[in-house]
Amino acid sequence: MNITKSAVISSLRDMKNFHDQLQGLYTANGMDLTQDVGRRNILMSLPMEHNLTKELKFVNEKVVNDGRTGKADIIITNGEIEEELECKLTSPHKSGAISLQSDFDTLERKGSLDYMYYIADRKFEKFVVIHFKGLTVDDFRSVSPGSRGKVQMKYSSAMSKAEVLVGKVKNSNHEKKRKIFEKIILTRRKANSRLTELQQRLEECSEKAEKKRENIIRMIDNCINTTEAKVFKLMRQFDDVTNKKPRFSFEFEDIQ
């Protein structure tokens, strides 16, 4: 299936227009559409599927928006290849946490599914859109009591199958590792500069000034030992972060 950033952005613009009209209707009748974003997102789910289908028709041979029980939200056909796409619309919780969910029974029955997750802010102005390819039950947590068959995504495995089309998804572990690596480089550079200076002082020092030479040599040894200890400690930190479960943050993109 062909899913482009431009197609997704066009669908978002149409969704925003529909949202504005719906919000106007609510306001005119003394209600606030954004008071309950969960209900708002339910109302916006069909426009999401409809508008994405409309845009995908420009880059695929055949695109059908069905969405009936037991049917995929969108079916995309190119040549003899027919692919299914599940679409989900969600928003951050009041705590800021973002939970991407799926229906366990559908996922278990299909074996593997592609997903489009539209994540909208409360005002429906900024978004993150992610296309996940070939997700399985292993990419989601187990069914919890009271979850009504819904399962939460495990970012640690699912993000390796993700293509972020709108906004950004950042792995905080990558950022931590980058900063540690920069510290290692800086530590090495400072040590090399200091060792160059000490080596020059040693070369310029008279052979007869034994105590002075011994002192410089001692400083060289101390510099090497101290640097290696610092680098070793940083490498341990780097390994610790590498072995930790990744944590992800979402950066929303304003759609005009």
Residue ranges and their predicted role:
Residues 1-71, 79, 89-256:
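Nucleic-acid endonuclease domains
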Residues 75-84:
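Active-site beta-strand-loop-beta-strand hairpin of nuclease catalytic cores
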